[in-house]
């Protein structure tokens, strides 16, 4: 069973690598909020204060964060379909394809 602490630990690593504090006006806030809710729902936990973990500072950070989230999805394939739909929306909003991420990050 994945614990809330593990989810927070993984997300905190994302935060240090690519996320910044932000408000609900930040780019792709809805998708990021949904991703947290998806993980929490799947593992039976409630993630609170999601807004503190939501910001992406710039486009390069978006690419890095999506790459890291992809790695997390690979570890937990149970959430893959729904999470990939969210990532695709992030991808579209960033104006990039996954093939371009390697050169962008």
What are the roles of these predicted feature ranges?
Residues 2, 6-33:
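Short, Lys/Arg-enriched anionic-surface-contact patches
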Residues 5, 34-35, 60-63:
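Non-catalytic, well-ordered alpha-helical scaffold segments
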Residues 11, 51, 78-82:
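Recognition helices and adjacent regulatory flanks at domain boundaries
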Residues 18, 44-47, 73-76:
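Amphipathic alpha-helical interaction segments
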Residues 29-45:
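Short, amphipathic alpha-helical "recognition" segments used to contact nucleic acids or chromatin
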Residues 38-43, 52, 68-71:
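Short basic/hydrophobic patches in alpha-helices and adjacent helix-turn junctions
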Residues 46-48, 52-65:
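Short, basic interhelical loop/turn and adjoining N-cap
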Residues 68-105:
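Intrinsically disordered, low-complexity basic tails/linkers immediately adjacent to helix-turn-helix/homeobox/MYB/SANT
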């Amino acid at each position: 069973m994945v614990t809330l602490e593990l989810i927070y630990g993984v997300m905190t690593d994302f935060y240090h690598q690519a996320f910044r504090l932000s408000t609900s006006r930040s780019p792709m806030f809805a998708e990021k909020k949904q991703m947290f809710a998806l993980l929490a729902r799947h593992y039976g936990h409630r993630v609170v204060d999601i807004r503190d973990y939501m910001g992406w500072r710039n486009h390069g950070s978006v690419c890095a964060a999506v790459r890291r989230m992809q790695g997390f999805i690979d570890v937990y394939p149970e959430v893959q379909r729904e999470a990939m739909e969210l990532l695709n929306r992030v991808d579209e909003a960033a104006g990039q394809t996954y093939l371009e991420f390697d050169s962008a990050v």
